[in-house]
Every structure is written in C-alpha cells, then in structure tokens.
UniProtKB/Swiss-Prot annotation:
Post-translational modifications: RNA-binding phosphoprotein p12 is phosphorylated on serine residues.
UniProt-listed GO biological process terms: viral budding via host ESCRT complex
Protein name per Swiss-Prot or TrEMBL: Gag polyprotein
Site keyed Cleavage: positions: Y128, P129, L196, P197, L455, A456
Region annotation Disordered: where it falls in the sequence: 107-126, 136-195, 420-447, 467-490
SMART domains given in the database record: ZnF_C2HC
Gene3D superfamilies noted in UniProt: Gamma-retroviral matrix domain (1.10.150.180), Human Immunodeficiency Virus Type 1 Capsid Protein (1.10.375.10), Zinc finger, CCHC-type (4.10.60.10)
Gene that this sequence comes from: gag
Lineage, top ranks: Viruses, Riboviria, Pararnavirae, Artverviricota, Revtraviricetes
C-alpha cells in the first residue's frame, strides 16, 4: 500500500527485520505475534491514548511505558516491546516518514472528537471489510438487561451510506469495535481506543452500585487479525494460548464471545480437547478440581447460560468461566510425553544460549507434562541444556567443577562467555586463509624435496652410464669374470691353488721376475 495509507504498526511489520535488529542491539528479544497483539489489543486498554494502529508519539509511548514498568500491576512481558517502540520514536529509521504523514493518534484523535466528546466521521474505508463469507457465524444475542447492540453487527455488510463515509481510519484496526462510531449516548459512551465486549457506559445507578456495562460483540476484523497472525493451536499452542489469556483479562468476553473465539480460532478436535480439559479444572468448594457433575455444569456450562453481566453474580460467574477456559487451554496445550522431540532441540551455530534455553523449555512444555521452571525439573533441563548445546559450549560446560551445584543462570553465564569469545566471520575467514596458505607452503616444500631427489637420481644415473661407456672394451672380459665362482679364504686368485694368496703366488713372481745386470755384465 502507499505511504499515505501506512500506519506505524504496518510499517514495523513491513520492516520487521530492521525492528528485530534494533531489538537485538538493545539486548531484548521480541516476537512478531506479540508485537501486534500488544499494539492492537493490549496497549489501547491502558486508556492513555494509544491507538490500535500504533503511534510514534513520544508522550503516548512514555505513558504506556510508565504503566508497563509499574512495580505493582505492571507488565514485565511487555517491557522489551515498549522499549523498542520508544527507540523507534527517539531514533526513527529511514522508513519512518514524518508524523504528519502517518495515521497516529496525536493527529487523529483531535479530528475524531468534537465539542462534547463525539467522534467526527472517519474518512477512509477499512482494510479488512466486514465479510460474511469468512466466518459463517451469527451475532451473539444481547443480554436482556443490556442496552441494544450497535446497528451494524459483524456478520452483516455495512450500509452504503456508511461505506461512502468510511468506517474507520486506515490500519489493521479499521472496522473493529474500537474504530466504529459510538452509540448515540453522548458523553456516556465508551472510549474509542478501548475495544472491549463489555464496556462501562455511565456512572452506577446507586452510590455503591455496579457500573453498567454495554455489550459490543467481536467484529470479523478482530477475528481475522487474530486468526491470520497466530499459528494453529496444534502447531504451536503458545501463541493462541497467550492471546486468549490476554483477551480474557483485557476484553472481558461473555460466554457467547468465548464460544465465538473457540469456533473461529480452533478446529473441532482442538475445541473438544480444550473443553474437556477445562471441565477437568473446575474447582470445588475446597479449592481443588472437582468431579461433581452439577458443580462442573454450573461453573462451566456447555449450553448458553442466563448470566447477567450487569449483576455481581453474573460477573463473578463470567470471571470463573474465563479462568476455567484458560486452564483448559493450558491443559490442552500439553501433549503426551515425547522426550525424543525434546532431544531434537539442538543449539544452532549462531544461536545465543538464552534463546536456545527458551526453545528448550518450550519443548519441555509442549512434549512433556512437566513444568521446566519448577524446582524438580531444573536438573533435567540443565542436563539437556549442556548435552544439546553447541560443541564448544558443551565442552566448556562439561569441564566445570561441581557441575551439580551450578544453577541454570550460572550455566547461561558460562555459555555466554564462550559464545561471545567465538571468532567473528572476518576472523574465521582470516584463519582459514592462513591455514590454506600454510598447506600450500607445505605442499610446495614437499614438491621441491621430491624434485631434488629426482634430480639427484638423474645425475647419479648419468655418472653410472658414463662409467659404463668408458669400460665397453672390457665388457667381454668382465662378462666371464662376473660368472666365475667365488674364491675360498685360502685360495689364490691367480693360480687357483690353495695355501696362498695372489700377491704371494710363486707363479706370478716368476712371470714378473726380470734380469738384473751386475757390474761385471
């Protein structure tokens, strides 16, 4: 889409690689699904002006950050995400245009609200139209005592007049409850930045009474965003479990909303497993899971109950139902014990030890019924962490003295030391280059040595052939002599007789004897 229709959230999702790099530079880990969930669903409920499509407004980001960092009632799991948002606002990357060109809350809220707090008419069509072919679901009927629902349910197409005016600003939140025109209740209408099925519509009727709630059903855009941005429950149950756990706390869904979420986000087999696990987790009078059918049906009914959300009893029953449903989600997420799957989780060549430990603990949660963070399982997790780490880290950890006394945090510190001391890619290339040069030098030396031997052999053979050429005339004489039998120790080489050697042979002396002239001669 064009730059004029971009939102802060869509920009960050389109450039997610840059956002991940910035988070890595800040030494934090973020995930795409949670990034979108917190921006579009969680932070708008803080009532500080955060729009579901996100914003780079520093004041709004600081307000959200103060709530996230609260000592009591804070949200530690959201700390990395708001830190990255603030860093993007303080040091915007090149792909972030000026604030005036983005649909941020600071520029839109002033245009939405007129005197008296009423929102002005939006100007753009929603990105996700209200489709009735995506989810063939009927709108849950309103409770008897609640005010009538808005005239445009999520299963019906918008009227032509509304289509001409537009149903909301651009961004993934367009067309959701939070971006729809509010009901004609004047100043008593709910805040447009809060997307809750049950929302306060005015002060209590009595001084100590309950605040009346108005029912706003989920829209198809909400369901479409949640379904498309999270993996299936069978593939990775953590994503949808975290989403529904967050929705139960922030959106306060009714029984009908819970059934709609189960119908859209889960398959038939997954729904049956979740409901079965939830009914196993219904608490009895003593606070322990009960097996009494009447208590189970009362706390977690399978058929639509007549609970009034504007009474204390109805709200309490809805609260118990939501808690039980979350317990069922967590129970259904556990699979039969399969330690082979846990052993398949190995540390990657460039994977940080902390990220590897998180994957390992997630495998324990998915493929075993154990809680890896419990005291009884820390030893098993530690041994798996050591045995399945990278070879250099594994070698270092196995050499630690008193290994049984080290905690997981200690092992992580030691693994981080080895990880950060690894040679960089440039150092690795330089080392490989030096090793290649050294191998080539050794090969050249071997070749030179072999060549020297060959030359020496050639020279010696030439000398031998020269000696042979000089003695060609004696070849006939040498041939018989070479064939003579060897002499004995006391045998003469000249006369072949025994008892003397050739230099003492009398025959040889006689042959060489010459006449000596005397004075008389």
């Amino acid at each position: 889409m064009g730059q004029g229709e971009s939102t802060p959230l869509s920009l960050t999702l389109d450039h997610w690689k840059d956002v991940k790099t910035r988070a890595h530079n800040l030494s934090v880990e973020i995930r795409k699904g949670k990034w979108q969930t917190f921006c579009s669903s969680e932070w708008p409920t803080f009532e500080v002006g955060w729009p579901p499509e996100g914003t780079f407004n520093p004041s709004i980001i600081s307000a959200v950050k103060r709530i996230v960092f609260q000592e009591t009632g804070g949200h530690p799991d959201q700390v990395p995400y708001i830190i990255v948002w603030q860093d993007l606002s303080n040091s915007p990357p090149p792909w972030v245009p000026p604030l005036a060109k983005i649909a941020v809350a600071s520029g839109q809220d002033n245009g939405r609200k007129s005197a008296g707090g009423r929102p002005s008419a939006p100007s753009r069509l929603p990105i996700y139209p209200e489709t009735d072919s995506l989810f063939l679901l009927s709108e849950p009927p309103p409770y008897p005592t609640s005010p009538p629902p808005p005239p445009a349910p999520h299963a019906a197409r918008p009227a032509p007049g509304l289509m001409a005016e537009g149903l909301g600003s651009e961004g993934p939140a367009a067309g959701t409850r939070s971006r729809r025109p509010r009901s004609p209740t004047g100043d008593t209408g709910p805040d447009s930045t809060v997307a809750l099925p049950l929302r306060a519509v005015g002060p209590p009727a009595e001084p100590n009474g309950l605040v009346p709630l108005q029912y706003w059903p989920f829209s198809s855009a909400d369901l479409y965003n949640w379904k498309s941005n999270h993996p299936s429950f069978s593939e990775n149950p953590t994503g949808l479990t975290g989403l529904l756990e967050s929705l139960m706390f922030s959106h306060q869904p009714t029984w009908d909303d819970c059934q709609q979420l189960l119908q859209v986000l889960f398959t038939t087999e997954e729904r049956e497993r979740i409901l079965l696990e939830a009914r196993k987790n219904v608490l009895g009078v003593n606070g322990a899971p009960t097996q009494l059918e009447n208590l189970i049906n009362e706390a977690f009914p399978l058929n639509r109950p007549q609970w009034d959300h504007n009474t204390a009893e109805g709200r309490e029953r809805l609260l118990v139902y939501r808690r039980t449903l979350v317990a069922g989600l967590k129970g259904a997420a556990r699979r039969p014990t399969n330690l082979a799957k846990v052993r398949e989780v190995l540390q990657g060549p460039t994977e940080p030890p902390s990220v590897f430990l998180e994957r390992l603990m997630e495998a324990y949660r998915r493929y075993t019924p154990f809680d890896p963070s419990s005291e009884g399982q820390k030893a098993a997790v530690a041994m798996s962490f050591i045995g399945q780490s990278a070879p250099d880290i594994k070698k270092k950890l196995q050499r630690l003295e008193g290994l049984q006394d080290h905690s997981l945090q200690d092992l992580i510190k030691e693994a981080e030391k080895v990880y950060h001391k690894r040679e960089t890619e440039e150092e690795k290339q330089e080392r490989e280059k030096k090793e290649t040069e050294e191998r080539e030098r050794r090969r050249d030396r071997r070749q030179e040595k072999n060549l020297t031997k060959i030359l020496a052999a050639v020279v010696s053979e030439k000398g031998f052939r020269g000696r042979q050429a000089g003695n060609l005339s004696n070849r006939a004489m040498r041939a018989p002599r070479e064939g003579r039998p060897p002499l004995d120790k006391d045998q003469c080489a000249y006369c072949k007789e025994r008892g003397h050697w050739a230099r003492e042979c009398p025959r040889k002396k006689n042959a060489r004897e010459t006449n000596v002239l005397t004075l008389g001669d």
